[in-house]
Amino acid sequence: MITVVTVLRTGGGTYTAEWVNRLHAGVQRHLPVDHDFVCLTDDPRGMDRGVCVEPLRHDWPGWWAKQELFTPGLFDDLVIYFDLDTVITGDLVPFTGYTGPRAFLRDFFRYRENMIGSGMMLWMGDEMADIYREFTKDPEAHMRTFRRRSDEFTKRFMGRGHFIQDLWPGLVVSSKAHCRTGLPENARVVCMHGRPRMTELEPKHWLRQRWEAVA
């Protein structure tokens, strides 16, 4: 069974159950194969009925809550992860053929080509469990060392992994790098990163309207 998953750690002031529900609606519309939609969260209130809730077990702040995605035994088979500030704009079926072991985004900005992005990730079963095991040896030390970006910690485990943009050219795009004049042809996933957040865009902005129309 394919699992599509996201993470909602409350307390940051931006993300709420509304973001989970809109992402869920986009996935439901564009993934016409059997799958579960799971949200790891510390507050399940307000989530749509079709969202399977998995409680966050640790009090790791902000983006560090993503490390719980890699908990051994949490998922079987193919896992597709999306950040909450992701807009699903087309058919997701091409991603369902991935057989592992793990795939990350290549950072969208040329000057950081050697960095990964974790706004979308794919992996099989426990293929990412090594990340969790290493992090849980000393979470406080890792959060101090990699305090600017959890992706810097995750990059150490790229190993035999793939870059998503190499596997599916043009299907996953950046709102900042690729969408200034509209949605690129064949784009299936739009990743927003940094500011402006979706809710900070003008109400008439085409991407915000597309995001709001999906639910």
Predicted regions, residues:
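Short, hydrophobic beta-strand segments that form beta-sheet elements in well-ordered domains
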Residues: 33-42, 79-86, 102-105, 163-164, ...
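GT-A fold catalytic core of metal-dependent nucleotide-sugar glycosyltransferases
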Residues: 45-55, 65-115
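Short, well-ordered beta-strand micro-motif
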Residues: 71, 122-124, 191
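Conserved catalytic core of nucleotide-sugar-dependent glycosyltransferases
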Residues: 92-156
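Catalytic core and acceptor-binding pocket of nucleotide-sugar-dependent glycosyltransferases
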Residues: 129-215
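A short, glycine-/small-residue-rich helix N-cap motif at loop->alpha-helix starts
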Residues: 58-65, 149
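Short, polar loop motifs at secondary-structure junctions
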Residues: 37-46, 86-93, 151, 168, ...
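N-terminal anchoring/stem segment of glycosyltransferases
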Residues: 1-61, 74-75, 194-197, 212-215
